[in-house]
């Protein structure tokens, strides 16, 4: 949601976020290796435009209301990271919605209603306060977070830290 409304050239985005394409490529290479081990073949070269994702987030919220949130997230991610589609483009989101069996007129009406934008921006601001700056992101117990592609050991450590904090809190209640 922090990208300009119309999105931006991918190379300009990579320079701004990572300090250059070469640094981004090193990070993407690690993500690609992790993806291959999970059976996912990322196609970062197909991405030439970095979209503003507010409507993508709103699309997922709509899908959640229909009980298809997980499917919507997966299809949006596939569309962007595997197919290089512009997931900030309303017509792309409506096409994905049609694939998922949504009534596209209703989806269009939902996306036309701008009243849900502030909620997305509020969630984004909260994520930034928690230190989240990329996807995927994990928040445990509302206070511990990591973002971006992480090794399983890092995620395990996050869970260990949260578990230890819960033990400390429970011990304080018992003795306090």
Task: List each language-model region with its residue ranges.
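C-terminal cap of thioredoxin/glutaredoxin-like
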Residues: 61-176
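Structural alpha/beta surface segment adjacent to cysteine/selenocysteine redox centers
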Residues: 1-83, 169-173
């Amino acid at each position: 949601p922090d990208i300009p409304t119309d999105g931006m050239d991918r190379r300009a985005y990579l320079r701004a976020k990572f300090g250059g394409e070469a640094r981004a490529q090193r990070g993407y290479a690690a993500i690609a290796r992790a993806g291959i081990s999970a059976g996912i073949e990322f196609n970062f070269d197909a991405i030439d435009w970095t979209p503003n994702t507010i409507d993508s987030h709103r699309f997922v919220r709509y899908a959640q209301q229909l009980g298809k949130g997980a499917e919507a997230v997966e299809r949006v991610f596939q569309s962007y990271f595997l197919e290089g589609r512009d997931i900030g483009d309303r017509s792309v989101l409506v096409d994905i919605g049609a694939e998922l069996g949504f009534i596209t007129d209703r989806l269009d009406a939902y996306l036309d209603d701008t009243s849900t934008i502030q909620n997305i921006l509020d969630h984004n601001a909260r994520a930034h306060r928690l230190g989240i700056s990329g996807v995927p992101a994990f928040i445990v117990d509302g206070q511990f977070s990591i973002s971006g592609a992480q090794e399983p050991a890092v995620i395990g450590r996050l869970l260990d830290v949260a578990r230890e904090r819960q033990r400390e809190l429970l011990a304080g209640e018992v003795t306090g």
